[in-house]
Amino acid sequence: SETLANVSNLEARLIEQEVFAMCWSATASVAMVALGGAAVAVTAMRGEPKAIWITLGFFTVMEGLQAVGYAVVDECSNPANQSITLLSYLHIAFQPLFINAFAMAIAPSPVPKWQARRVYGLAALATGFMLLKLVPLQALGNCTPGSPLCGLQTCLFSGDWHIGWILPLNGFMEGFSSTFGIHIWFPAYFLAVFALPLWYGAWRFALFHLLIGPFLAFALTTNPNEQPAIWCLFSIGIILVSLSSFIRVRVMGAHQPA
């Protein structure tokens, strides 16, 4: 009976893994691409601010990269695998610009042009810091083994129930990662997407992003290299905010464009 119980437990775990695999697959990513494309079309035709539908399109591209990535997952020596991994990191690096553009579009009050220019400048600085992590500079050392996206090679691989990425990043700014006892491995990114929106009043959106971005990713997997890919579920939230006037106005407190 003990043997039968062990077999039953094993079968249960396998079924659970299969369910997760079915939920997170190339098919699911393709469906997200279709949903994102439809959302871009709808918001553009409705005359929404460009920042909204362009950001939707930007995150739809990430879902496309993930969908294509499934075709070469775990093939670390495959140039296509390496290229998709690099493109995925570049997408993450440029996210501060698009996230702030979106957040300013749904801020409680219109953001003055002078302030928007400074926001984009600071977001671009964060992007520059992210890109600098790719440069193999001996003076900056290597990224910390076990930290998000850190690896000895560039590869897209199978995670616990989604995909993950690793790259041979350098150790730039990792000295700030343990400030206040909290490990934040990409501090410039976090400041740009979570703190910067507070400056122009988009604190609700920043909190929303925090909950469905890193908190959701950390809750769903303990694999630090898989968490960024799951974080891209954030695109679902962007779609909801973009398409639902109730969520945008009542929940996010967005201003009404003139």
Give the residues covered by each predicted segment:
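Hydrophobic alpha-helical transmembrane segments of multi-pass membrane proteins
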Residues: 54-69, 215-216
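Membrane-interfacial loop-to-transmembrane alpha-helix junctions, especially the N-terminal start
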Residues: 47-56, 115-119, 201-211, 230-231
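Membrane-proximal helix-loop-helix units in multi-pass membrane proteins
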Residues: 102-189
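Internal transmembrane alpha-helix with an interfacial aromatic "cap," most often the third helix
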Residues: 40, 65-78, 88-122, 130-135
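Non-cytosolic membrane-interface motifs at loop->transmembrane helix junctions
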Residues: 76-88, 229-234
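Hydrophobic transmembrane alpha-helical segments in integral membrane proteins
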Residues: 15-36
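C-terminal transmembrane-bundle signature of multipass membrane proteins
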Residues: 195-258
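Hydrophobic cores of alpha-helical transmembrane segments in multi-pass inner/ER membrane proteins
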Residues: 29-38, 90-105, 186-195, 234-248
